[in-house]
A protein has these predicted regions:
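Conserved catalytic core of nucleotide-sugar-dependent glycosyltransferases
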Residues: 120-122, 144-148, 152-248, 252-253
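Short, well-formed alpha-helical segments that are part of the catalytic scaffolds
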Residues: 82-97
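A conserved hydrophobic helix/loop-capping motif in glycosyltransferases and polysaccharide synthases
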Residues: 74-82
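C-terminal catalytic/acceptor-binding lobe
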Residues: 2-12, 20, 207-323
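Asparagine/serine/threonine-enriched low-complexity, disordered tracts
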Residues: 18, 25-30, 34, 40-45, ...
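Active-site-proximal specificity loops/subdomain of glycosyltransferases
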Residues: 103-141
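Extended hydrophobic secondary-structure segments that form protein cores and membrane-embedded regions
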Residues: 76, 107-114, 144-151
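Cell-envelope/extracellular polymer assembly enzymes that use nucleotide-activated donors
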Residues: 72-74, 208
């Protein structure tokens, strides 16, 4: 009988993720994220620990009445050095796509990586969520979080509902094999999924969160879905080359990527619609990565470089498993 090594490794990784999520959601598994440091200015004080406890019973943890000043949906957009695209995004969303939305029913925040390190899309989305959890600690679990790209939006209103319910992830735009582009998820479900991996290179974070959502039993609904090539979704051209980390591919294929709870020493301050993220530590050191340029015209599939699964990596670049 022939066996596929790739299939065996994939099944093993899925089982590891399943066990990890099970253990992390046990009664006493979570440690408080006591390194989350919101900053209003350069001398900001440390706030109390940010709890990472995930409610097991959704109805019991959802407030019956939500104040009028709490939005029903929050857009989180990973961001750095895209000022013109940001202006166009806000103009089009407010004047066209969301023009009929009641005032105060939604908020848009740009999770701004405010440092010189490689851009970490997963961490920006994770920290954007954590910042909103801090802002709405009693109600974040029932808010619909919409993860969106700054260079992408519907051409007209009423194409996308930007709403979902508990247990359902609404994927509106992207590819079927990953939760990228535009999707909506309830705060409690995002927290249960453990969020995105904090990869330092392009790609794969969307693959991981799709796997995590499925592992905990969430349904991915694509009944209102637009493929990446659909011209009804406006998407700015941003070149063909992407910076990838060879280490990310190895972690995705052979190990367990880090997650929402791996982020430490987070420092941020909010200015208008910016969440300015000045520092964070994750499960892997960006200075210990090996980066390369990838031309997306050659496809989106990232392969494990030959010999990389046998390399010796610095201990602080590997996420320490909890099982």
């Amino acid at each position: 009988m022939a066996f596929s090594l790739t299939a065996i490794l994939r099944d093993t990784k899925k089982q590891q993720i399943k066990e990890y999520v099970k253990n992390m959601h046990s009664a006493n598994a979570f440690a408080p994220m006591n390194n989350f440091v919101p900053m209003n200015n350069a001398n900001a004080n440390h706030y109390p620990p940010l709890s990472a406890n995930v409610p097991a019973n959704v109805p019991a943890n959802v407030p019956a009445n939500v104040p009028a000043n709490v939005p029903s949906k929050i857009f989180i957009i990973p961001y750095r050095n895209r000022e013109n695209q940001k202006k166009e995004f806000l103009r089009h969303m407010k004047e066209v796509v969301l023009v009929d939305e009641p005032e105060g029913s939604y908020e848009i925040y740009f999770a701004h990586q405010y440092d010189a390190r490689p851009f970490n899309r997963g961490a920006m989305k994770n920290i954007g969520f954590l910042a909103m959890k801090r802002k709405y600690p009693l109600y974040y679990n029932q808010i619909t979080f919409i993860f969106h790209d700054v260079d992408t939006f519907p051409s007209v209103k009423d194409m996308i509902g930007y709403e979902t319910t508990y247990g359902i992830v609404k994927h509106y735009y992207g590819y079927e094999f990953a939760l990228g582009g535009i999707f909506a998820i309830k705060g409690i479900d995002f927290e249960r999924s453990l969020g995105f991996p904090n990869f330092w290179g392009w790609g794969l974070e969307d693959n991981v969160i799709q796997e995590r959502c499925l592992e905990i039993g969430l349904t991915i609904d694509r009944t209102e879905f637009y493929h990446m090539q659909d011209t009804r979704i406006i998407r700015a051209f941003d070149g063909f080359n992407r910076i990838i980390s060879k280490r990310d591919t190895v972690v995705y294929k052979r190990e367990t990527p880090d997650n929402l709870t791996s982020l430490k020493n987070i420092k941020w301050f909010i200015t208008n619609d910016y969440i300015n993220i000045t520092h964070f530590d994750s499960g892997m050191d960006p200075n210990s990565q090996e980066y390369a340029s990838h031309d997306i015209r050659n496809g989106n599939k990232l392969l494990v470089p030959q010999g990389y699964d046998r390399r010796s990596w610095k201990i602080n670049t590997t996420f320490k498993k909890h099982f």
